[in-house]
């Protein structure tokens, strides 16, 4: 109750009629200052360890609650495939693992700028239906709110260019390997050079964004899309990988009292590659804690 009152007070001080995400971020930054008296430095090992321990304690507390959230993601994915297999034309999703992997791949670029439910789910499903109908992966993202393959509001988010790039890579892989070969490749390790070469063959330039390591470093195939959307696809396939979306970035920075960028905007993504790598270490340390 005290937290809600403070968030409401922060919102009112800015002239907001109801609290916004920015107001909650300010509350957490204020709370952090009250506890520690300063920001914690993620590059300082002692501060980093303190944030890891605090995070692990929060998770243990939450797991002891009646509604812990444990397993919700896996259950949602399982239920999604069960529901999709009831759609005419998608019956194979009930037991066709390769087709399921293809859907999880299509769900990655179509997630950009969208909520998982219903926008992302509808867009990925429409793309799969389009492929099964024509034999070609669609690469021209429909506008937000469009009716696609008979599905209402199955368009993509505002960043059409980013969606288009990911779909081109998937299209190239399916055309050159077939669906079964694609599924094997998507969940198998490849060098960063191979991922980059695939992107170039699909008409793109440069290595996948956010994927660190030298040209001989190994990464699962889905990372050809880049760190964020590639790991999102891995999550849908049951792999433990941290998607560094706005929610994760906010949670990570909350533990250091650093939820805002120098310009005052909310930190909604890793600020640079070193921070991205530190986030990976953070997750590993919390799991070990």
Describe the residue ranges of each PLM region.
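HhH-family (HhH-GPD) DNA N-glycosylase catalytic core used in base-excision repair
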Residues: 2-289
């Amino acid at each position: 109750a005290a937290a809600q009152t403070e968030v409401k007070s922060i919102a009112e001080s800015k002239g907001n009629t109801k609290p916004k995400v920015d107001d909650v971020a300010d509350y957490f930054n204020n709370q952090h200052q009250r506890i520690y008296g300063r920001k914690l430095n993620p590059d300082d090992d002692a501060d980093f360890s303190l944030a890891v321990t605090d995070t692990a304690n929060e998770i243990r507390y939450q797991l002891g609650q009646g509604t812990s959230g444990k397993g919700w993601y896996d259950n949602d994915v399982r239920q999604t495939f069960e529901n999709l297999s009831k759609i005419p034309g998608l019956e194979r999703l009930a037991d066709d693992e390769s087709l399921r992997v293809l859907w999880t791949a299509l769900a990655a670029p179509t997630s950009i700028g969208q909520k998982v439910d219903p926008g992302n789910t509808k867009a990925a499903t429409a793309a799969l239906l389009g492929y099964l109908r024509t034999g070609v992966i669609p690469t021209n993202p429909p506008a937000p709110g469009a009716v696609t393959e008979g599905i209402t509001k199955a368009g993509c988010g505002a960043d059409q260019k980013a969606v288009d790039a990911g779909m081109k890579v998937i299209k190239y892989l399916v055309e050159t390997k077939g669906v079964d070969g694609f599924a094997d490749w998507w969940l198998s390790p490849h060098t960063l050079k191979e991922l980059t070469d695939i992107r170039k063959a699909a008409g793109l330039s440069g290595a996948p964004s956010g994927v660190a390591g030298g040209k001989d470093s190994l990464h699962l195939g889905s990372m050809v899309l880049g760190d964020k959307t590639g790991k999102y696809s891995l999550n849908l396939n049951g792999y433990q990988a941290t998607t560094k979306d706005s929610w994760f970035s906010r949670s990570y920075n909350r533990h250091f009292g650093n939820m805002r960028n120098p310009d005052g905007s909310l930190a909604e993504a890793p600020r640079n590659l070193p921070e991205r790598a530190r986030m990976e270490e953070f997750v590993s340390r919390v799991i070990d804690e």
